[in-house]
Amino acid sequence: MKIVFMGTPEYATAILRALFENNFKISAVFTQPDKPVGRKQILTPPDVKKFLLESHADTPIFQPSNIKTPEIAKKICEFSPDFIVVAAYGQILPLEILEICPCINLHASILPKFRGASPIQSAILEGEKISGVTAMKMGAGLDDGDILGFSFCGIQKLDESEVFHKFGNVAAKLCIKILQNFDDIAPLKQKNVLSSKCKKIKKTDGLVKFSDSADEISAKFSAFKTWPGIFLENGTKLLEIRKFSDEKKEFGKISHITKDGFTLAVKDGEIEILKLQEPSKKAILARDFINGKRLKIGDRIS
């Protein structure tokens, strides 16, 4: 069975690794272009490419900035794949590719809920306790293809990176099961009336305000752990926090000095700050921040 694989982050790598381990023929891999990362803007390959270079360097790798060209569709046809497997690739496939062979997408939600680019972050933001992975036969619409199978997972008290890691392993097992039993599966139509969409995450989504509730800020911290993180209006990044209480106080002020840092009163509760980073400065433990600025209960940090 010949597979053309399309994926980019660690979530996709877990699936690709399982395909190799189960002796599927990976004819080619498509992933996003290398991107500059960090303050020094070092050109960095995506996780899928790193894995291939380390473990399967003979596998053809393609990194088109635009997948919607006739040349790409022609190149895929040359590999004569039995399936195209897609997992968090990062580009929408054109009809010319979808018509080559069955295209199976491993989407990180239980469809039709959270169609779109940020299903894991959206599930965390909405306080979902259970989500999962759906294997779907791709069509022309956005994540609206027929369902081939799904696996449920608990996500309560997990942050984005933890959910991605967990879902990667779940998706890998589901993918193998679907491919091995594809001819015996009766696809299930999605109920569009139950659908919801999620947007692509922007850097500005990480902004938190003292007028946000403690639960909202905690959810944002968990959802945006990898990127963009959360930050105050003055640009201070909150690198480690936890919900402290539901006690209502005048928000925006320091409400407690704790052994690990300090608490801030926000709408409907308090959050404890453990580590933070002011603009153009190094990250610092919250207790050192408090001591260095000689802040006390009732003071504001911005």
Swiss-Prot record:
The Gene Ontology terms for molecular function here are: methionyl-tRNA formyltransferase activity
- Which GO cellular component terms are attached? cytosol
Q: Which domain of life is it from?
A: Bacteria
Annotated positions binding (6S)-5,6,7,8-tetrahydrofolate: 109-112
Q: Report the InterPro entries cross-referenced here.
A: Fmt, Formyl_trans_C, Formyl_transf_N, Formyl_transf_N_sf, Formyl_transferase-like_C_sf, Met-tRNA-FMT_C, Met-tRNA-FMT_N
The protein's annotated catalytic reaction(s) are: L-methionyl-tRNA(fMet) + (6R)-10-formyltetrahydrofolate = N-formyl-L-methionyl-tRNA(fMet) + (6S)-5,6,7,8-tetrahydrofolate + H(+)
List the residue ranges forming a coiled coil, or say none. none
**One Pfam family recorded for the sequence:** Formyl_trans_N
User: Which keywords are on file for this protein?
Assistant: Protein biosynthesis, Transferase
Q: What is its EC number?
A: 2.1.2.9
* NCBIfam families xref list: fmt
Q: What does this protein do?
A: Attaches a formyl group to the free amino group of methionyl-tRNA(fMet). The formyl group appears to play a dual role in the initiator identity of N-formylmethionyl-tRNA by promoting its recognition by IF2 and preventing the misappropriation of this tRNA by the elongation apparatus.
Q: Which family does it belong to?
A: Belongs to the Fmt family.
Annotated protein name in UniProt: Methionyl-tRNA formyltransferase
Q: Encoded by which gene?
A: fmt
